[in-house]
Amino acid sequence: MSRIGYKEIDLPSGVEISQDGNVVTVKGPKGTLSREISPLIKMTIDGNVVKFDRDADTNKLKMLHGTTRANVNNMVEGVVDGYKKVLKLVGVGYRAQLKGNKLILTVGYSNPVEMDKPEDVEINVPDNTTIELSSINKEHLGNFAAEVRAVRSPEPYKGKGIRYENEHIIRKEGKTGK
């Protein structure tokens, strides 16, 4: 059983954390993140160390304990280093471009797919088959990357589609003729 909820979070220099009721705010060199945590989980701040504790040992509280600690740790890492995901477009004629606040994907449909850029996610298109996404919020970054990938997820026969940079696609053999 995981005991991640009991691990302490060491705050790097330049990072401030505060709690106002159930809202935790983390400020760092790259920005500020806020998140509401469960009132059943107690957070204590001792200088540069953050600890989490729970009142009871029910299964729900055990899950919330580890999840809350992981979410706050992701906030601390995000305001210090940030997060980045790279997507590759594989296929003949597949390309991406950025026009203003819209990501335009040409991925084999009759019309290009337009996606609005979220506020806290930065999009960079260094070449027309690569999309670089970066953000301080790991959750929003992962959700947007999954939305982009879902536009044309990789198929198992030729591997065409939008995939993460280091993603391995399990390939299938086609039918054999008689």
From Swiss-Prot:
GO terms for cellular component: cytosolic large ribosomal subunit. This is Large ribosomal subunit protein uL6. The gene is rplF. GO terms for molecular function: rRNA binding; structural constituent of ribosome. Part of the 50S ribosomal subunit. This protein binds to the 23S rRNA, and is important in its secondary structure. It is located near the subunit interface in the base of the L7/L12 stalk, and near the tRNA binding site of the peptidyltransferase center. PANTHER family: 60S/50S RIBOSOMAL PROTEIN L6/L9, LARGE RIBOSOMAL SUBUNIT PROTEIN UL6M. SUPFAM superfamilies: Ribosomal protein L6.
